[in-house]
Structures are given as C-alpha cells and as structure tokens.
C-alpha cells in the first residue's frame, strides 16, 4: 500500500477542504466563465465547459479576467454553487479576493493554494480525492487514478 502523495504549495487563503478535484489545463475567468446559479462552467472555449465546480476543488493555472471576478464568485457562494477550494500555479489578487470576501460576507472558507509546478496535470487529475490546507499550502492526494 503506497502512502498518499503530498504536494507542498503556498497557502494564500486559510481553510480546509476534502473532496473531489476538477482540473483544468487552461486559465479561467469567472466573469462569463461560470454560471453562478448552477456552478457550471459556461465558457464554450474552456476545457471544463459543462462541468459543475460546485463543492469541488478547482485546479487551474491562473485566473483570466477582470475585477468582476469576485462579484460572480460571491454570487456562486451565495447560491451554494461555488468551488470549495482553489489551487493554482499562480493566484492573482482577484482570485484571492474571492476567498477573503466569501469569508467576510458569508462566513464561508475557500482555501486557496498556489505555487504548483507547471506540470501539475501529472500530479493532480479530475476526480482525484484530496485534502487541502489553505493556510500551510499542503495538498494531500487521498485517492485517484
């Protein structure tokens, strides 16, 4: 029996998550990319188009977007349809603001970890079950393919 895989990133927003991942190879913009009523990716050019992010750990290289990102994200949080954790190669301020505002307005912790290596798709895959600590930056793969 092999031990779980542990990946050390950088903690950007505190909180803990245990659950399933949705892993994308493309940057993501929440504004016009996520339906905040359903949590489904609606950007037709995105590799996760049609996938629900609701309650999942969402892994993508970096955000693509605007200052509207936190507004869409907060609407998804309010509707119970937001990703429950975010993991990036590089998290920019608008992504981190999503987690901080979710905590401030709705008392919902959305852990964020960045600092993944560029070849993260070799380490994390859609459907993997993980534990994420947003304070320490630790990602532990519990099960997967």
Range-by-range predicted roles:
Residues 142-145:
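Intein/HINT protein-splicing elements and their conserved insertion hotspots or analogous self-processing inserts
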Residues 3-14, 21-140:
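Feature captures the catalytic cores and cofactor-binding loops of soluble hydro-lyases/lyases
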């Amino acid at each position: 029996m092999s031990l779980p895989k542990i990946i050390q990133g950088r903690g950007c927003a505190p909180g803990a998550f245990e659950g399933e991942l949705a892993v994308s190879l493309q940057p993501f913009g929440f504004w016009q990319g996520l339906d905040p009523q359903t949590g489904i990716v609606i950007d037709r050019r995105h590799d996760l188009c049609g996938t629900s992010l609701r309650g999942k750990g969402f892994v993508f290289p970096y955000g693509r977007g605007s200052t509207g990102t936190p507004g869409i994200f907060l609407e998804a949080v309010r509707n119970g349809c937001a990703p429950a954790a975010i993991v990036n190669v590089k998290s920019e301020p608008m992504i981190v603001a999503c987690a901080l505002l979710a905590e401030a307005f709705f008392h919902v912790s959305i852990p964020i970890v960045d600092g993944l290596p560029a070849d993260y798709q070799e380490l994390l895959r859609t459907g993997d079950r993980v534990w994420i600590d947003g304070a320490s930056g630790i990602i532990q793969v519990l099960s997967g393919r």
